[in-house]
From Swiss-Prot:
Membrane topology: Single-pass membrane protein
Protein name: Uncharacterized protein aq_1894
Species whose genome carries this gene: Aquifex aeolicus (strain VF5)
Disordered as annotated region, ranges: 85-155
Keyword Transmembrane: yes
Amino acid sequence: MVIMLIFASSTGTILPSKKAKSMEKDFSIFQGNKLNLKYKRQREEVMQKKHRLIFLATVLAGLILFYFGVDTWMKQKQVQQNQPPPIVIKPVAPVKPKTQESNQTTKKEVKQEEQKKEEPKKMVQKQETQEKREVKKSEKNEVKQTQEKKDVKVAKKVPKTEKKAANLRTYKFQVGAFRYRENAYKMAKIVRSKGFDAQVVKVGSLYRVYAYVKAKNYWEAKREIKKHFKDAIFVRK
């Protein structure tokens, strides 16, 4: 038996039992590692699922919040659009009573009528003052020209035969035009006092005063009339 054991040990027949044990250990280790790997994989899968669930939950929460936020914003916008625009109240000017307006219009009409009535009066007054000035001028000329009157009187004393020989002609001059008859006749009286024949003729709305001058020619007649009436105008027959 001892020899067989020695032979078995020398040949290695006992080795298979050790290998089996070592193989069992290795197998058990391999299985343990395999189980660990499975467990790790399961844990990783669980963690991945958790992460996915968390991500999905956050996305859903964000979508829900976004939806409700947009919904509330849209509602507020619709409410603002549906609200009527603010009414602007403008200040209203105080309405004046009609009585004041009517009084003002009547006053204006009365003033206009008074102005219309006063205008012809003013025109008449201006014409009267102008006529009076002309009469005064003629009277002043009459006072200044007393010496010329004497010369005219001397000329009147010349014999008629000499005048006929000279073939004297009569020239017509206008010495004034007046609106009122009285002023015209006053002027005619002054013309006669100067030694000239005078005539008052109404032409239109004016009374014209004409003086007739006897002289040899036009220039002599003009010289004679201009001595007394500087504004005299020659009138052709």
